[in-house]
Every structure is written in C-alpha cells, then in structure tokens.
Amino acid sequence: MLAYIIRRMLILIPTLIGVSLIVFTMLHLTPGDPAELLLGERATDEALHQVREHLGLNEPLYVQYGMFVKRLMKGDLGETIRTRQKVWTEIKQRFPATMELSLVALMISCVMGIILGIISATKQYSIFDYLSMLGALIGVSMPIFWLGLVFMLIFSLNLGWLPISGRLSTDVDLSIVTNFYILDAILTGNWAAFKDAVWHIIMPAITLSTIPTAIVARMTRSAMLEVLRQDYIKTAKAKGLSRFKVVFKHALRNAMIPVITTIGLQFGVLLCGAILTETIFAWPGMGKWMYDAVMQRDYMVIQGGTLFISTLFILINLVVDLLYAVINPRISVQ
C-alpha cells in the first residue's frame, strides 16, 4: 500500500510539469498584453516597459517558464497582476468557499443519485425507472448556466424564497474560524448565520449538483443491475433473506466500486465546474476568481489556480483508489 502511494505521488511531478507547460504555452499564445490591461489603454510606453520588465514579460518564453518553475520549487506561485497579493494567499482565502459549495453539491449528488439508482434497479422497467432515467438524461444534457439563471428567476426574483447571490447576508455577523461558513456557524453556535449560510448555498449547490446527480444515478442503476443478476444474489434470496438485506448488505456493497470511481471523478468535475456556477451566483470562490483572471489575462492566477486544482484532482483519484480496498477487501492494491 505504501509503495503504491509513493509511486502515485511520484507520478504527480511529471503530470504537474505537463499541466503547467500546457497552460503556460496556451496563455502566451492568446492575444492581449497583461501590462496594458493592468495600466489601461492610455498608459505611456515607458510605463508599459517598466511593468513588463517587473513582471518578466520581456524575457523569452523559455526564460519566463524557467522563472515560474524556479518559484514553484520554492512554493511560490507568484503574485497576482491585479492586486499584487501572493497567489497562494488568494487561494487560501477563496478555496474554502469553492470547497464548501462543491462538498454540499457532492452530498446532494451522492444521496439523490444513489437512491434513484437503487430504486430504478430494483424496479427495473417500472414507471419510476423510466421517469428517473429520463430525468437523469435531461440532467446530463442541461446547461448549468441556463439552469442557474432559471433558478434565480423563479426562486429569487419571482418567489423571493432564496437569496440571489453571495455566501452570507450583509447584516449577518459571523466569527470566521475555518472560512467554511456553515461549519463556522456550527462551531460558534451562531444559528442565525447557519440558517443564512444554508439559505445562500441551496441554489448554487443544486445547480452545480444537477449533472453529477444524473451521472451517479445512471452508474448506480447499471452497477446494481449487474450485481443483482449474480448467482450469489440468487442464493441469498433462496435462503430467505429479506429484500432489504439482499439489496443493501450484499448487492449495494459490491455495486459501489464503480460508483465510487464515478463520485471521485465527479468531485473533481465539481471543482472545475464551479467556475460557471460561482460566476452566475457571484459566489466568492476560486471559480469566479479564475474567471476574472482569464478576462484580465492574469497569468499568475491562471497558472497557480490550474496547478492547485490539478494537484487536488490527482489526490482525489488516489483517495478513491485506496477506498476500493476498504469497501471490498478482496481487492488488493497492486
């Protein structure tokens, strides 16, 4: 197990080098001048030259990339062009908001997707099965930005049930402990802030969870149907075990292996897909931060944010692989 983890961590190094090289190359091939965006169109040539010199933009591309890698080896992701703050500092400030949104969306996806998949598998070809799989197909095909706008129109503007944007109302005070607002409200016993934070996260979390819920439901149904056809399930039924024990004790545990793979991948997708959701709902997380960076050609933010999310995605996949042995002891890590 330990040797496997070490090998996977070593693979992380060339993967991140490849990601950084691709992102660096693509950013420098796109039109636009970060110095001009920073100073404005009326900036003098001398001022532009000074900014380019300070940012190292006058150097050849291979020199700029070498400077970036050298800083990266020291744990320095550089400074943002817009605010002049350290990229790592900005990530630490904004990542909890994205993580909180992604975790809530993942919880919704897991609960709803697995329940729908189990019921559809145990009631194959029933009306519920057809309707749930039709809903899953629609969910997979649904554009997130369109769904988010529809939710805002219905539940915020027309009905006034849910707040339209942000993480917390301006008139609600909350003592920050972890920067996860829901958790902070629980830790400090601030139930007014807890209610407000939950109220704010409902719409963006449901919007973000739509596609993963549909994918998890389809995968759970497919895996359950395959397991329910196995001989040991028929034997369990012949022994007189209750339907509940057959489904949840014997079938579900073996069906969860591909489902966990799907959930792990979807968690990574949620972190990336949060860009659209955060932009629509003005959620102050990494997604909106990176979107603004793309619009303003802030190289350091895009590179640092992409590397951070890529590292997280790889680590999530490693955790998913290790969970296989926990769920099914017959599987050994090779």
Regions found by a protein language model. Name each.
Residues 2-3, 95-96, 100-128, 144, ...:
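Alpha-helical transmembrane segments of integral membrane proteins
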Residues 6-16:
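N-terminal signal-anchor/signal peptide hydrophobic helix marking the start
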Residues 58-114:
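An internal, D/E-rich "acidic patch" concept
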Residues 9, 51, 61-77, 87, ...:
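Hydrophobic alpha-helical segments of integral membrane proteins
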Residues 30, 139-142, 271:
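Transmembrane helix irregularities
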Residues 15-66, 155-193:
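Hydrophobic alpha-helical transmembrane segments of membrane transport/permease proteins
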Residues 129-155:
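Pore- or pathway-lining transmembrane helices of multi-pass membrane proteins that form conduits
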